[in-house]
Amino acid sequence: MGQMYLQRFAYRDRVHKAELDQAWAEAFKTFAKTGNWGGVEKGVTHHQTYGTGWGGLVLIEVEDPDAFGHYQAYHNKTYGHVVQVTWEPLFDMDREFEETIRNSR
């Protein structure tokens, strides 16, 4: 299993609807072609996208750091004018603290 990341995208203020629609159109084409929002053929696996009123969250798994670099650059180049994107590495807190919780009984 690779490193899991939570990707957050938030719509920028004062973005025109036409710009946002154009970015989404490109995003849908990218996803249809590669199975992820970052346009990489392998090395980044998309698990789920969640929408919110301010943008959304994407759960991805990274197996190849170079592919992740391309994934990030694609976002900055293609969507950066309409959304602010951040990536946070995740760890399994349930597994990490399982013994501590068990010993707290």
Feature roles, as predicted:
Residues 1-55, 62-71, 90-105:
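Short S/T/G/P-rich N-terminal loop/turn motif that feeds into the first structured element of a domain
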Residues 79-93:
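Conserved short beta-strand edge segments in small beta-sheet-based binding/regulatory domains
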Residues 73-77:
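Short, intrinsically disordered, mixed-charge
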Residues 36-38, 78-81:
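Short, structurally constrained coil/turn elements
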